[in-house]
Regions:
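Conserved FAD-binding catalytic core of PHBH/FMO-like flavoproteins
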Residues: 1-90
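Active-site micro-motifs of SAM-dependent methyltransferase domains
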Residues: 2, 127-128, 160, 165
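Active-site-proximal flexible loops/turns
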Residues: 4-6, 111, 131, 149-150
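Short, cationic motifs built from Arg/Lys/His that form the positively charged side of catalytic pockets
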Residues: 5-6, 123, 162, 191
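FAD/FMN-dependent oxidoreductases across multiple families
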Residues: 51, 60-135, 139
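C-terminal helical "tail/cap" subdomain of flavin- and related membrane-associated enzymes
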Residues: 91, 133-134, 149-206
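Short, small-residue alpha-helix embedded
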Residues: 138-152
């Protein structure tokens, strides 16, 4: 995890291993120029273009509990992930994934800010959400805009606003995570009835 944040905070960042790993790489000569998203059991990956030359980024998040193996056996873990993608999806990598890098995913357990209020931290560096929340990119953009407003003098309460927003996102994302992963038909029935009423509540929708 970021050593820079540790230096800025002058304390260890409050993070923990999320029992998942990220595999990133580059694909070339792709015929499909669209953004592709694949959701599977215990893994998902995204393929998106980075230029007009049919070059693409590939990023996957896979459930993986053995942190020591991730640290010490990169090639073995890479092959396991690639085999899983090949066996459980129709996406064919054809040994075309280059510049692969593998790293464990850490998420934040607490909201920590620097003592120096002239230092602004944003995105995952400020608070790393679980990848399943799908909030990384949007919160990076949103927090960068809030920093801009602070620098322009339009606002002066960046960290206070971020703390409130992060708490809302965590609560809502946790609710969604459990509410939409029910398998019992009876539980799903009552969930759907509850959502019909909640969807009419403006406070719930905020």
């Amino acid at each position: 995890f970021s050593k820079t944040k540790k230096m800025v905070l002058q304390k260890n960042p409050a993070v923990y291993f999320n029992n998942s790993v990220a595999l990133r790489g580059n694909l070339t000569n792709q015929k499909n120029k669209d953004i592709s998203i694949y959701l599977g059991p215990n893994f998902h990956f995204v393929v998106y273009p980075i230029n007009q030359n049919n070059d693409f980024n590939f990023i996957s998040i896979t459930r993986f509990k053995d942190l020591e193996e991730v640290k010490n056996s990169h090639n073995t873990v890479k092959n396991e992930i690639l085999n899983q993608i090949t066996s459980k999806t129709s996406y064919i990598l054809d040994n075309n994934l280059k510049n692969m890098s593998l790293y464990p995913v850490y998420v934040s357990s607490d909201f920590l800010i620097p003592n120096n209020k002239n230092i602004f931290i944003c995105g995952d560096a400020l608070f790393a959400f679980s990848p399943s929340f799908a909030q990384g990119a949007s919160q990076s953009i949103e927090s960068a805009f809030e920093i801009f407003n602070n620098l322009q003098g339009i606002a002066n309460n960046y960290y206070e606003n971020r703390k409130i927003k992060i708490k809302k996102i965590k609560n809502r994302s946790n609710f969604n995570h459990y509410a939409f992963h029910f398998s019992s038909p009876l539980t799903i029935f009552f969930r759907n009835i509850s959502l019909k009423f909640l969807s009419k509540n403006n406070k719930f929708l905020e």
